[in-house]
């Protein structure tokens, strides 16, 4: 896999509430030079980043609580709406796992519906925190995420564990299943501990073995903060 192919699906990430304007300009300058799919930042940085980025590079805003997702639909909706007003093209939002036999249930459905409504017209990536879930829960949550209209299911924040090979297999299988059963093409975003080219190539090979059509920035993303240095070597 060549460097351009990786850049085309990369969400270059800087999630630091204390990031200075110089920090944000630095990541935007790198993005403008190398052309990733998106730059992913906290919602309070969206307006500044949008003004620094070239056209064609999306701004992805993390909204609604991170790394712990919010549990109030109104608060999540307002957070996402603020990010959209600031210029976000894409929204990354955590659906916080609950330690309950009814997870995912009606409460989680209401949160997902709020995320989708608030991000209408924008790309929505729902983070399900796979390191905290077993296989059954990963499958069930992914199906609910896709059924409520999210554009991508995203593995994890990376703050409570990383993206495993099994996560890539399960998420891509469920996205393929949704495409076959519902006729709707959705995407997978893999993030959490992805630092070197070999990580990307291995995970993409797993996705490709499930469904070769899950490719390109509209259906596959890699979220990483330090990967760029490695792939440019």
Q: Model-derived features: where do they sit?
A:
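Active-site cofactor/substrate anionic-group-binding motifs, chiefly glycine-
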Residues: 36-90
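Glycine-rich, proline-tolerant flexible connector loops at the mouths of alpha/beta enzymes
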Residues: 28-48, 64, 91-107, 156-164
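Hydrophobic faces of well-ordered beta-strands that scaffold small-molecule active sites
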Residues: 6-14, 39-41, 58-64, 91-93, ...
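Alpha-helix-loop-beta-strand connector modules within alpha/beta enzyme cores
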Residues: 43, 47-66, 103-130, 143, ...
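Glycine-rich phosphate-binding active-site loops on the catalytic face of alpha/beta enzymes
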Residues: 61-67, 85-99, 147-164, 191-199, ...
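Active-site mouth loops of central-metabolism enzymes
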Residues: 5-21, 60-77, 98-103, 125-137, ...
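Conserved, mostly hydrophobic/aromatic
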Residues: 11, 49, 83, 126, ...
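Catalytic cores of alpha/beta
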Residues: 71-82, 133-144, 168-172, 184-210
């Amino acid at each position: 896999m060549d460097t351009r192919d990786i850049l085309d699906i990369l969400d270059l990430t800087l999630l630091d509430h204390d990031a200075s304007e110089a920090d944000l300009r630095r990541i935007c300058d790198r993005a403008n030079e190398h052309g990733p799919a998106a730059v992913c930042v906290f919602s309070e940085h969206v307006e500044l980043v949008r003004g620094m980025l070239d056209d064609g590079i999306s701004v992805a805003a993390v909204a609604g609580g991170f790394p712990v997702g919010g549990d109030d639909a109104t608060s999540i909706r307002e957070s996402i709406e603020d990010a959209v007003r600031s210029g976000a093209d894409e929204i990354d939002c955590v659906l916080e796992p609950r330690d309950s036999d009814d997870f995912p249930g009606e409460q989680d459905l209401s949160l997902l519906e709020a995320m989708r409504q608030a991000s209408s017209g924008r790309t929505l990536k729902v983070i399900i925190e796979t390191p905290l879930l077993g296989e059954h829960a990963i499958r069930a949550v992914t199906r609910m995420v896709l059924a409520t209209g999210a554009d991508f299911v995203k593995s994890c924040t990376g703050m409570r564990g990383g993206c495993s090979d099994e996560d890539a297999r399960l998420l891509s299988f469920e996205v393929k299943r949704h495409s076959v059963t519902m006729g709707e093409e959705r995407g997978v975003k893999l993030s959490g501990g992805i630092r070197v080219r070999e990580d990307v190539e291995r995970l993409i090979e797993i996705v490709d073995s499930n469904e070769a059509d899950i490719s390109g920035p509209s259906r596959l993303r890699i979220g990483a903060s330090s990967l760029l240095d490695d792939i440019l070597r």
